[in-house]
């Protein structure tokens, strides 16, 4: 069943979505670069004129969430560093509408593709090029017609398109053997014809605004999933903590009467939907009194927590000592455990959701 879920997720990521007849076609070789006016993560607004000092211009359509795009982030930075002194300017554009992205398309990332999250990625990765947001309407991106993230367009001094396609031939960092974008730049800088002007592009499909219905459909499907809660005793807790499977486990301890628990709980539901098709499992444990099991189930149902949910049926202090010796006992409490039972992350109190997602994705992996 999990293998089928992963296969479906791969289809969502990578298959061409031919049902969208309005998907744009790539700009043709020899065409002029369409102008744009887009906000950058650095607070500036950029048009083509902002790059007039460069003899050549590389526009890369990329995004935060896509594992392929993330796999190429460092390579794009390296290209920008290598060719800046040769008169080559670089700019990255995110064409994706954030509202057209399903949570289960975020399984390889800590960040989605909102403008605010782009600012975080640009800061975290210290991009050495402007990173522009076109997710409001995707209008500028449609004029270029990127087919996947990442997709490279290289223009000469007259801003005529000379190369379009992939960066290189291998997604996995350090394994490329054909460096198409680099070869194109070398030729242009040397005043020679580009050896290969156009290639196909492998990566995540562009999340155009007309794909919002697809994302909304997922929300409706998740709302129909069954929610259950089982009782958990001390022996079962120890088995759970040994984590003898292959998945990383995120354990959230909560109660219906705990205000901070209730406030942060939707973050865990989101993380479950993001990462559950990976080597990841969310487990929630309620410390409500056992006679309030129906109340706990009612809360979980309202929150659509269709994960593995428990309510502890033993002594609370025995539970505290049995879960984590470093836990003082206040709720909420969160643990992230590796296969084999090693505690990677422990937090008493409300989590920093972004920080926790970073911990998770660095363990389960950002790329294929």
Task: Describe these PLM feature segments.
Residues 36, 150-167, 331-346:
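A short, hydrophobic beta-strand/beta-hairpin element that forms part of a small beta-sheet core
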Residues 87-111, 127-137, 279-293, 305-315:
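Thiol-based oxidoreductase modules, predominantly thioredoxin-like and allied folds used
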Residues 18-35, 177-178, 182, 188, ...:
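N-proximal helix/coil linker or "cap" segments that precede and/or mark the start of modular domains
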Residues 1-24:
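Bacterial Sec-dependent N-terminal signal peptides
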Residues 63-75, 253-270:
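Conserved redox-active cysteine motifs that mediate thiol-disulfide chemistry
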């Amino acid at each position: 069943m999990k293998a089928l879920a992963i296969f479906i997720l791969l289809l969502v990521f990578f298959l061409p979505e031919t049902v969208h007849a309005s998907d744009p076609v790539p700009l043709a070789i020899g065409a002029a670069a369409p102008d744009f006016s887009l906000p950058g993560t650095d607070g500036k607004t950029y048009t083509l004129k902002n790059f007039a000092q460069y003899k050549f211009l590389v526009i890369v359509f990329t995004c935060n969430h896509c594992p392929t795009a993330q796999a190429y982030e460092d390579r794009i930075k390296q290209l920008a560093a290598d060719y800046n002194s040769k008169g080559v300017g670089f700019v990255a554009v995110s064409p994706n509408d954030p509202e057209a992205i399903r949570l289960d398309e975020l399984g390889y990332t800590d960040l989605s593709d909102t403008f605010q999250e782009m600012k975080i990625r640009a800061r975290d990765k210290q991009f050495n090029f402007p990173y522009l947001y076109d997710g409001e309407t995707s209008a500028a991106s449609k004029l270029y017609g990127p087919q996947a993230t990442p997709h490279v367009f290289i223009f000469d001094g007259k801003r005529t398109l000379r190369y379009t396609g992939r960066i290189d031939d291998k997604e996995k960092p350090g394994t490329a053997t054909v460096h198409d974008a680099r070869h194109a730049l070398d030729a242009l800088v040397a005043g020679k014809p580009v050896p290969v002007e156009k290639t196909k592009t492998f990566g995540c499909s562009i999340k155009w605004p007309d794909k919002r219905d697809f994302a909304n459909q997922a929300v409706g499907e998740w709302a129909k999933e069954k929610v259950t809660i089982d009782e958990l005793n001390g022996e079962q807790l120890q088995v759970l903590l040994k984590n003898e499977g292959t998945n990383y486990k995120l354990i959230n301890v909560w109660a219906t009467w705990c205000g901070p628990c209730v406030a942060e709980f939707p973050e865990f539901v989101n993380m479950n939907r993001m990462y559950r098709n990976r080597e990841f499992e969310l487990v929630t444990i309620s410390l409500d009194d056992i006679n309030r099991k129906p109340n706990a189930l009612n809360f979980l149902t309202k929150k659509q927590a269709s994960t593995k949910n428990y309510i502890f049926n033993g002594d609370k202090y025995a539970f505290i000592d049995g879960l984590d010796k470093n836990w003082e006992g206040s709720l909420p409490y969160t643990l992230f455990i590796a296969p084999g039972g090693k505690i990677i992350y422990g937090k008493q109190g409300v989590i920093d959701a972004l920080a926790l997602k970073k911990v998770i994705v660095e363990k389960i992996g950002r790329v294929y």
